[in-house]
Amino acid sequence: MCIRDRLIRLPKELVYRYGAVLFELGKKRTVAVLRELKLDNNTIDNTGRLVDMHGMEITEDKPLIRHQASSCGAAMYEMVLRFEYEFYMAADDRNKAMALKKQEALFKEILENGDCLTLKELAVTGNDLIEAGIHPGKEIGNILKSMLDDVLNTPEHNTKKYLFDNHLHI
């Protein structure tokens, strides 16, 4: 598949275009090239993330989808899904493209359900942990990450009571 075929299918935004041209370089080299071109940081960061996520596992497993989305943010994850879909369509790999459409539908379901994807959306905050007697520092971060991981796997666990009962061992 040639670059032209990829570019024809993709949206006009620069992030998609640069991603299509530079994805084979990997994230580190893509970011270096874009910095040399003196592009804005937003374009550089988003293109780097798009390239980094290229080739992600295609899945119908909601917990894995939540983990993938959590790793880059919901807005970026939507961009990645669109990029991957157009990439596979340009490569005439309809099976992967259709699987990505299913994955996108599941992701929309996740968003509609209001599932927690970030620490900010977690029912417990760092201040809650401090009030519970945990000393500020790495331990709070580790506990919050553990809680988020649990909630990404099982969204129903995103309640203060459940998270305190199952993650705080004071």
Task: Place the predicted regions along the sequence by residue.
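C-terminal subdomains that position terminal phosphate/3'-OH groups for nucleotidyl transfer/ligation
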Residues: 4-170
